[in-house]
């Protein structure tokens, strides 16, 4: 079902470093990421769950799974978008996140919306 154009959701991510919430001397680097989820398909669909793989610069990986996003399970009509912002703490100046959303269309079809890997980096540390 992943290749069926009726069931397509596009995800855009904008990460940023939160210097005021970070304490580098304690190995605490805070990042926010703003997400835009748009139903680019032809059928209304609801976001049911999220699945994240978070990797820091030391190769330490954490898997985060949960229902919905920011306490919601938004239903998106074709062309409609949902925006939210969340955050993550890393022990290193750099890392990355990637994952996917579990979706279910109004006709009962289940599918996933991939979230491409994106970089989390303290400014001026990316080489």
Swiss-Prot record:
Q: Which top-level group of life is the source organism from?
A: Bacteria
| Pfam families per UniProt | DUF525
Per the record, the GO terms for biological process are: error-free translesion synthesis
**Domain ApaG, chain residue ranges per copy:** 3-127
Q: HAMAP family recorded for this chain?
A: ApaG (MF_00791)
- What name appears for this protein in its UniProt entry? Protein ApaG
What organism is recorded for this protein?
A: Xanthomonas campestris pv. campestris (strain ATCC 33913 / DSM 3586 / NCPPB 528 / LMG 568 / P 25)
Q: What is the lineage of its organism?
A: Bacteria, Pseudomonadati, Pseudomonadota, Gammaproteobacteria, Lysobacterales
